[in-house]
Amino acid sequence: MPKTAKKHHRKSNGPIEVSSAIHTGSSAKLKKKIRDIERALKKHEKLPADKKIEYERALKGLQVELQNSQKNLKEKENASKYHMVRFFERKKATRKLKQLRKQFDEMQNTAEPSKKELKKLRKQVKHGEIDLLYVCLFPKAEKYISLYPSQSAEDINDPNVKAGLRKTEAKRLQFRKEVEKLMDEGKLLFTVDDILAGKKVYHEFYKSSTTEKEIDAPAAKEEGENGEEQDDFFE
């Protein structure tokens, strides 16, 4: 009788190698390894307790690694896609803030400064600081929502587009509130002056109100700005 080829089966309780998938950071390899472990846990329900714990820990580790890998990929995509928008909006926010600070200082140094005008300017300066922080801190893993949209919901006739713009405006205001709260509570590890000095800053928003599916409002174009100017702040 002809010899039949022997089939090689992996032992049901054999170890599943995960380090190679984790160290590569490849989403495809991570997904495959996750499926392998999930299949093993489902197929072999009577695994030894220690082996089951080992597999479950490996699965959690791989899922976290996959999430990080996808987040890093999205950040790279958005960094390229929204680079120029953020670059021009940062310049605009910086210019406006410097003008407001100058006006405030001039008002303070007058012979008899108006308390009412000082209070008004102080509030405007704070809003200018929030605008600059908004541009710099907006999560790179999410679709960037322009701080200076060229159109408002009231200028649009299409009800679907109008609804999308209103929802986007709500997200924009919500993120500004998050930034203001961080600033008021002193939870930022840098100052607005650090940004104005050109220092690189970073803050991780673990939970943001923005979502990838929101309709973004178009950004207003800056006149007189040179698009070829280099900016390593967002790179």
From Swiss-Prot:
Biased composition regions of type Acidic residues, renumbered to the chain: 225-235
Chain residue ranges for the region called Disordered:
1-31, 210-235
Q: Which GO terms describe its biological process?
A: maturation of SSU-rRNA from tricistronic rRNA transcript (SSU-rRNA, 5.8S rRNA, LSU-rRNA)
Q: Name the Pfam families for this protein.
A: Efg1 (PF10153)
| Origin superkingdom | Eukaryota
Show the coiled coil region(s): 25-126, 162-185
InterPro entries tied to this protein: Efg1, EFG1_rRNA-proc
Subcellular location(s) of the protein: Nucleus, Nucleolus
- GO cellular component terms listed in the entry, alphabetical order: nucleolus; preribosome, small subunit precursor
Q: Which UniProt keywords apply?
A: Coiled coil, Nucleus, rRNA processing
Q: Where is the composition biased (Basic residues)?
A: 1-12
Record flagged with keyword Coiled coil: yes
Query: Compositional bias of type Basic and acidic residues: which residue ranges?
Result: 210-224
Q: What is its main location?
A: nucleus
Q: What does this protein do?
A: Involved in rRNA processing.
What protein family is recorded? Belongs to the EFG1 family.
What is the protein name stated in its UniProt record?
A: rRNA-processing protein EFG1
The record lists the organism as: Lodderomyces elongisporus (strain ATCC 11503 / CBS 2605 / JCM 1781 / NBRC 1676 / NRRL YB-4239) (Yeast)
What's the encoding gene here? Answer: EFG1
